[in-house]
UniProtKB/Swiss-Prot annotation:
Its main location: membrane. PROSITE patterns: CYTOCHROME_P450. Its cofactor is heme. Belongs to the cytochrome P450 family. Gene3D superfamilies: Cytochrome P450. Cytochrome P450 monooxygenase; part of the gene cluster that mediates the biosynthesis of heptelidic acid (HA), a sesquiterpene lactone that acts as an inhibitor of glyceraldehyde-3-phosphatedehydrogenase (GAPDH) and a growth inhibitor of the salt-tolerant lactic acid bacteria in soy sauce brewing. Heme binds at residue 454. GO terms for molecular function: heme binding; iron ion binding; monooxygenase activity; oxidoreductase activity, acting on paired donors, with incorporation or reduction of molecular oxygen. Keywords: Glycoprotein, Heme, Iron, Membrane, Metal-binding, Monooxygenase, Oxidoreductase, Transmembrane, Transmembrane helix. Its EC number is 1.-.-.-. Pathway: Secondary metabolite biosynthesis. The chain crosses the membrane at residues 5-25. This is Cytochrome P450 monooxygenase hepC.
Length: 509
C-alpha cells in the first residue's frame, strides 16, 4: 500500500518539475523583456553557458561569430546583452552616461573581493570617481616624462641581453613579457629588482637580468584565469569564500587580494621608511597623500597590486602581437625598416630613440594601432548595469537592471566599421589613405572608453612605442618556422600565448 502511494508521488513531483521547467523556458524565450533579442538557445536559459564558453578560452572568438550571425545586439545570458556597435558602446561607457547609473555589474565583486579601494572592481560610479581622482595624477601623460628614463634603463638591459643571443633562435615573447613586467616593478620584495617595478617603485625585479620570472607570471595568470569564469558563477565564489575556514583556499583568484596584496603592503611600507624623492608612481602617490590625506597607505598598496595585474599582461600581449603581425607581413616589416633608415639619415632618430621621436613616426604608430585592433589586450565583455529608467538600443527598449556590455574584440572585428578586410593586418588604414575612408578610427578602444578606461594607458603606450622603435633600431628579426599560429590562442582575461620563436640578427648597416 505504502509503495503504491510513493509511485504517484514520484510522478506528481516529476510532472511539477517538468511544468516549472517548461514555464521557465517559455518565459525566457517568449515573454522575457529580452526575448526580442536574438542569441543561442542555451544562453537564454542560464548564465552557465557563458561561464562555460569563458572557461574554454574561446569566448572572444565565439562573441565575434555570434555578432556576425545575429547582428549588433546578442543575448548572451538570461539577463545579459552583448552590444557590438560603437554608438551603443559610447552610450554605455561615456562620461555623460556613467554618472547616470551605468554601474559595473555584480560579476566584478569576484575581482574586488573585500578591497575597499579598487578601481577595477569597485561597482559604484560615485565611489570609483572619487578614488580615481585621488590617484589619476600619478598616471597622467605629464607624469610619463619622469618615467622615460626608467623605461629606457630596462630597454637597454633587454637589448644587451638580446645582443648576447644574436644569430640564435629565441622566444622573443619570453623576453617581452619580462620586459613588460619590469617597468612597473612587480611588487615583490623577495625577488630581485626590474618597467612595472622601475616605474612603480624605482626598483626593477631582476627578471630581465636573470632571464627567469621565478614563477610569478604563472601565478598571476592562474589568478586572472580563475576570475574569468568565476565572474559568471558568483554563487560558487561566494560559497567558496564562506567555506575557506573549513576547506582552505582553492581558488587562485584570491591571490590578488592575498599573496600579492601582502607583498605590496611590505613594499609600500619599506618605501615609506626608506624615504627619498624617486620620481615613480608610488612617490607621486605619497606626494598626493600630503595634500589629500584621505588617500591612505593601504589604498596605495591596493593600487600597487593592481599595477601588476592590470599592467603586465596587457602590455605584454600588445608587444608580442605587434612583433608577430609585423614578422608575418613582410611588406609592413620592410616599409618600417626602410623608413627607419630614412629617418636615421635625416637625423630624425637618435640612439637611444626618444619617446618624442617614436611618437612622431606615423608608420610606427600605425603598426601599433593596427596590432592593438586585431589583438586587443582586453578581449572580454565589460559588463554594466542599465539604470532603472532603462535605455534604447537600436530602437528597442532595454529595461533597467539588465546587464549590457561591449567587447573591444567584437568592435575591432566588425566589418561594418573597418571594411571587408577587417581581419587583415593593414597599418595603412591609420594613415591618410583614401582607400580606408570607410574605417571609423574612433572605434579603436583597446583600453576601453570614458571614466572607467585604463588608468595606465599612457604608460602602456610609452613602453610599447619606445620598445618597438629601439628593438627594430638594433635588430633584424625574422619569424622562425616553428612559431605557432596565434589565431588559435586562448583568452582568460589574460592571453595564453604560444612561444614567439624568432631568428635574431644584429641590424644591418
Amino acid at each position: 500500500m505504502q509503495q503504491n502511494m510513493i509511485i504517484p508521488s514520484f510522478w506528481t513531483g516529476t510532472a511539477i518539475i517538468g511544468l516549472v521547467a517548461c514555464a521557465y523556458v517559455s518565459y525566457q524565450c517568449l515573454l522575457s523583456p529580452l526575448a526580442r533579442f536574438p542569441g543561442p538557445f542555451a544562453a537564454k536559459l542560464s548564465k552557465g553557458w557563458r561561464a562555460y564558453k569563458t572557461a574554454n578560452g574561446q569566448w572572444h572568438r565565439k562573441l565575434v561569430d555570434l555578432h556576425r550571425k545575429y547582428g549588433h545586439v546578442v543575448r548572451i545570458a538570461p539577463n545579459e546583452l552583448s552590444v557590438g556597435d560603437p554608438s551603443s558602446f559610447r552610450k554605455i561607457y561615456s562620461p555623460a552616461e556613467a554618472g547616470n547609473g551605468f554601474n559595473k555589474a555584480a560579476c566584478y565583486s569576484v575581482v574586488q573581493g573585500n578591497r575597499p579601494f579598487d578601481l577595477t572592481g569597485e561597482r559604484n560610479e560615485k565611489v570609483h570617481s572619487e578614488q580615481r581622482k585621488l590617484v589619476a595624477t600619478a598616471y597622467s601623460m605629464s607624469s610619463m616624462v619622469h618615467f622615460e628614463s626608467k623605461v629606457n634603463v630596462v630597454i637597454e638591459t633587454v637589448i644587451h641581453k638580446l645582443e648576447a643571443r644574436c644569430r640564435k633562435t629565441i622566444d622573443l615573447g619570453h623576453w617581452l613579457q619580462m620586459w613588460a613586467f619590469e617597468p612597473t616593478r612587480p611588487l615583490l620584495n623577495s625577488l630581485k629588482p626590474d618597467v612595472i617595478g622601475s616605474v612603480s617603485f624605482s626598483q626593477p625585479f631582476g627578471y630581465v637580468e636573470s632571464g627567469d620570472d621565478e614563477g610569478v607570471f604563472k601565478r598571476i595568470q592562474n589568478a586572472m584565469g580563475s576570475a574569468a569564469w568565476l565572474m559568471h558563477a558568483g554563487w560558487l565564489f561566494r560559497l567558496h569564500q564562506k567555506l575557506i575556514p573549513i576547506c582552505g583556499n582553492w581558488l587562485a583568484v584570491n591571490d590578488r587580494n592575498g599573496y600579492f596584496f601582502q607583498v605590496a603592503c611590505r613594499e609600500v611600507s619599506g618605501r615609506i621608511n626608506r624615504g627619498g624623492d624617486d620620481k615613480d608612481i608610488i612617490g607621486q602617490l605619497l606626494e598626493t597623500q600630503k595634500i589629500k590625506p584621505q588617500l591612505k597607505d593601504l589604498d596605495i598598496s591596493f593600487m600597487m597590486t593592481s599595477n601588476v595585474f592590470a599592467g603586465s599582461d596587457s602590455t605584454s600581449i600588445a608587444f608580442q602581437s605587434i612583433f608577430y603581425l609585423l614578422l608575418t607581413h613582410p611588406a609592413a616589416h620592410d616599409r618600417l625598416m626602410r623608413e627607419l633608415r630614412e629617418r636615421e639619415e635625416k637625423g630624425e632618430l637618435s640612439d637611444p630613440v626618444s619617446f618624442q621621436e617614436a611618437e612622431s613616426w606615423p608608420y610606427l604608430q600605425a603598426i601599433i594601432y593596427e596590432a592593438m585592433r586585431l589583438y586587443a589586450p582586453a578581449a572580454f565583455v565589460l559588463d554594466r548595469v542599465v539604470p532603472p529608467e532603462g535605455m534604447m538600443i537600436e530602437d528597442k527598449f532595454v529595461p533597467g537592471n539588465t546587464v549590457v556590455g561591449s567587447s573591444a574584440w567584437v568592435i575591432h572585428r566588425n566589418p561594418e566599421i573597418w571594411g571587408p578586410d577587417v581581419d587583415t593586418f593593414r597599418p595603412e588604414r591609420w594613415l591618410d589613405d583614401s582607400t580606408f575612408l570607410i574605417d571609423k578610427k574612433g572605434a579603436l578602444q583597446p583600453f576601453s572608453f570614458g571614466p572607467r578606461n585604463c588608468l595606465g594607458r599612457h604608460l602602456a603606450y610609452q613602453e610599447i612605442k619606445l620598445a618597438l622603435a629601439k628593438l627594430v633600431y638594433h635588430f633584424d628579426l625574422e619569424l622562425n618556422p616553428k612559431c605557432g599560429d596565434w589565431d588559435e590562442q586562448k583568452n582568460f582575461t589574460f592571453w595564453v600565448k604560444p612561444p614567439l620563436w624568432v631568428n635574431l640578427h644584429p641590424v644591418k648597416s
